[in-house]
């Protein structure tokens, strides 16, 4: 009454009972991989990845949801008021778009897109711009000083 349910397949060192078969090893170069294929060995490919330093991106989740639907949905763009606030704060600090871009480690055309209202909002970049310009760019009170003086 032996079935596939009862059998166990062992892969690796213990699979070679008696030590006769080829050893399991990792091919590091394409020549090693091709040699294994020519020899008729079983070749498996596994992707190694670590999840310790990665975090999920909610924007990516939203885009995946958009892919799943059949509806045509317009992509969110930066509001014009945010673009004007960036432009005014930048001019008050006497910065060019290029200088501001360098300050926040971005390309000048990205700053241009934000000021024109063409860019897709990126929370990390908006936070950098807020700190560099000292002006709120998210939530309520867009354009007000980041740290308003207390009364």
UniProtKB/Swiss-Prot annotation:
Region Disordered: start-end pairs: 1-32
GO cellular-component term (any): nucleus
Transcription regulation: present as a keyword of the record?
A: yes
**Which SUPFAM superfamilies does the record associate with it?**
lambda repressor-like DNA-binding domains
Q: Where is the HTH cro/C1-type domain?
A: 86-140
Does this UniProt record's set of keywords contain Transferase?
A: no
> PANTHER family from the xrefs?
ENDOTHELIAL DIFFERENTIATION-RELATED FACTOR 1 (PTHR10245:SF15), ENDOTHELIAL DIFFERENTIATION-RELATED FACTOR 1 MULTIPROTEIN BRIDGING FACTOR 1 (PTHR10245)
The UniProt similarity line reads: Belongs to the MBF1 family.
Sum up the protein's function in the record's words. Answer: Transcriptional coactivator that stimulates GCN4-dependent transcriptional activity by bridging the DNA-binding region of GCN4 and TBP (SPT15), thereby recruiting TBP to GCN4-bound promoters. Involved in induction of the ribosome quality control (RQC) pathway; a pathway that degrades nascent peptide chains during problematic translation. Required to prevent stalled ribosomes from frameshifting.
Q: What is this protein called?
A: Multiprotein-bridging factor 1
**Organism, scientific name:** Candida albicans (strain SC5314 / ATCC MYA-2876)
